[in-house]
From Swiss-Prot:
Organism field: Histophilus somni (strain 129Pt)
Alphabetical UniProt keywords: ATP-binding, Cytoplasm, DNA damage, DNA repair, DNA replication, DNA-binding, Nucleotide-binding, SOS response
Protein name: DNA replication and repair protein RecF
Known role: The RecF protein is involved in DNA metabolism; it is required for DNA replication and normal SOS inducibility. RecF binds preferentially to single-stranded, linear DNA. It also seems to bind ATP.
Chief location category: cytoplasm
Length: 358
């Protein structure tokens, strides 16, 4: 997938922008506060229906404006799509694909698989398990057409069960939820484990490129003891769950853990090494999607030079160029990108929310 054109209206300090992008690399240069990250945020929003910076729409809509509008032209081989999204201050979201109303954010997300690499993205490694579950679930969403409905049903059932836990006095009244919950828990966990295993070799191979001095290993944990039947566990833990007010064990506690030389990566790696590992994980997942589904990810790299030396920046850029992805890269100066000269690229300069092609 590639975005060939993007129109932005009233998104943060980007009041009126119309851009045509290169299918390869797009460099966005500007000082701090110029709107570089906001441009990446707008692209991300178009593909996810949410921001990676703020959950509050009013902070994203330009001052004294009722809404923001994003409109994009998307191309993949011989196919083209027109997508649009409007977010209003009242919270309403309007979406269109090829002129037709789109009711689900997942419709946009399916069209625009994206990998985001930002300085804050280290939470994938040093944050809680939810960040790593999201990493696995992103891959399954794009690989397995049945996953999203099962995942949505699982989350809905967990919410219903947690609400019921605060009202019931005996386990008998929970059985109606637990029969279906158990079925979905096993299905989602099976898919997660299979995907993690399929991704393992790609991760280890890519990590050898970026961190050859380390032996990186990965392991999947489903969220409860594999030797326990989940239905039995739910019944056994009823009193504890009721006291807590939520379901303690299950796929909502799953984790995908990383070790370097046998130790947790967050305990022994420097911040620079963690960023390299995070880049390797994002790259490996994007390349796995290309290999399995023949679909290219769009890569968004914010503050490209941060914590990466020139050699590693060049290595990452060469790998992205090789796999044929569309890439958006922000930097403060052109000098930070001087050794990265992909065959297909375009450079934009951003100042006070206004952008021009160089």
């Amino acid at each position: 997938m590639a975005i060939s054109r993007l129109i932005i209206n009233h998104f943060r300090n980007l009041t009126a922008i119309d851009l045509e992008f290169e299918r390869g690399f797009n460099f966005i240069i500007g000082n701090n506060g110029s709107g570089k990250t906001s441009l990446l945020e707008a692209i991300f929003y178009l593909g996810h229906g949410r921001s990676f910076k703020s959950a509050v729409a009013n902070r994203i809509i330009s001052y004294q404006q009722p809404h923001f509008i994003l409109h994009g032209k998307i191309q993949e081989q011989q196919h083209q799509w027109s997508v649009g999204l409007q977010k209003q201050r009242q919270g309403n979201t309007l979406m269109k694909i090829n002129g037709e109303d789109a009711k689900k954010i997942s419709d946009l997300a399916h069209l625009l698989p994206m990998q985001l690499i930002t300085p804050e993205g280290l939470t994938l490694l040093n944050g809680g398990p939810s960040y790593r579950r999201a990493y696995l679930d992103w891959g399954l969403f794009h690989h397995n057409a049945s996953f999203y409905n099962a995942w949505s049903s699982l989350n809905r059932l967990l919410k219903q069960r947690n609400s019921a836990l605060q009202q019931v006095c005996s386990y008998e009244k929970l059985k109606i939820w637990d029969r279906e919950l158990t079925k979905l828990a096993y299905q989602v966990s099976y898919w997660r484990e299979a995907y993690a295993e399929a991704l393992r070799s790609e991760i280890e191979k890519t990590c050898q490129l970026f961190l050859p001095e380390l032996e990186i290993s990965v392991s999947f944990h489903q969220g409860w003891d594999k030797n326990m039947d989940y239905a039995d566990l739910l019944q056994q833990n009823f009193e504890r769950d009721r006291a807590l007010g939520y379901t303690f064990s299950g796929p909502q506690k799953a984790d995908f853990r990383f070790k370097a030389n046998g130790l947790p990566v967050e305990d022994i790696l420097s911040r620079g090494q963690l960023k390299l590992l995070m880049c390797a994980l994002r790259l490996a997942q994007g390349e796995h999607l290309m290999q399995q589904k023949k679909r290219h990810c769009i890569f968004l790299l914010d503050d490209f030079a941060s914590e990466l030396d020139q050699y590693k920046r060049t290595l990452l850029a060469e790998r992205l160029q090789k796999n044929g992805s569309q890439v958006f890269v922000t930097a403060i100066t052109q000098e930070q990108l001087q050794q990265i000269q992909p065959e297909k690229h375009r450079t934009f300069y951003l100042e006070n929310g206004r952008i021009k092609d160089l």
